[in-house]
From Swiss-Prot:
The soluble form derives from the membrane form by proteolytic processing. The membrane-bound form is further proteolytically processed by SPPL2A or SPPL2B through regulated intramembrane proteolysis producing TNF intracellular domains (ICD1 and ICD2) released in the cytosol and TNF C-domain 1 and C-domain 2 secreted into the extracellular space. Residues 1-35 are cytoplasmic. This is Tumor necrosis factor. It is found in: Cell membrane. Residues 57-233 are extracellular.
């Protein structure tokens, strides 16, 4: 049997089928299409309502209710955002022009001394009694490791009005070199940041200083790497 004769037989068989069966099949197909369209529209409307009323979607960041679980810096940010900006605050930066010393500047675009705080003799003078967040960061940079052990220190000190003695509030020591660079080997660069921060009860007239032991290793390549500041809570 040829292919053409098989096709003709199939066409004749289709013509021989009762024409009345086409009616119920068409009605059933229309019913299914209507049901599918209804479910699609209902699902889209439900999803829109859930998104609109916040039942689903990105979760909001929540702060813990226990204040002890919040870092001092986070508490300072929350406190300052809810109160008028009349609290003492200072953020000073290092002078990249001062060779061999760490000198703080307040007359820069990214520096601030306000609401009674003063920068005197490279120290921040506290204008009123209260809790303060004190912070500072330095960045050291070097090339290779010498034979003598390199110890980098960063310290925040306080000279209180009640007793004229310098007392360390925060201090850290780091060593960037574990071993001496072998003779003839490539001297690779190293970087060592030190950050200090904490909350302290201060008195009016207290003086605060942030100091290091090896200023020749300070990195001033980018602004905002070496700074010192206080925020009244």
């Amino acid at each position: 049997m040829s292919t053409e004769s098989m096709i003709q037989d199939v066409e004749l068989a289709e013509e021989a089928l009762p024409r009345k069966t086409a009616g119920p099949q068409g009605s059933r197909r229309c019913w299914f299409l209507s049901l599918f369209s209804f479910l699609l529209v209902a699902g889209a409307a439900t999803l829109f309502c859930l998104l609109h009323f916040g039942v689903i979607g990105p979760q909001r960041e929540e702060f813990p209710k226990d204040p002890s679980l919040i870092s001092p810096l986070a508490q300072a940010v929350r406190s300052s955002s809810r109160t008028p900006s009349d609290k003492p605050v200072a953020h000073v930066v290092a002078n990249p022009q001062a060779e061999g010393q760490l000198q703080w500047l307040n007359r820069r675009a990214n520096a601030l001394v306000a609401n009674g705080v003063e920068l005197t003799d490279n120290q921040l003078v506290v204008p009123s009694e209260g809790l303060y967040l004190i912070y500072s960061q330095v960045l050291f940079k070097g090339q290779g490791c010498p034979s003598n052990h390199v110890l980098l220190t960063h310290t925040i000190s306080r000279i209180a009005v009640s007793y004229q003695t310098k007392v360390n509030l925060l201090s850290a020591i780091k060593s960037p070199c574990q071993r001496e660079t072998p003779e003839g080997a490539e001297a690779k660069p190293w970087y060592e940041p030190i950050y200090l921060g904490g909350v302290f009860q201060l008195e009016k007239g207290d003086r605060l200083s942030a100091e290091i032991n090896l200023p020749d290793y300070l990195d001033f390549a980018e602004s905002g790497q070496v700074y010192f500041g206080i925020i009244a809570l």
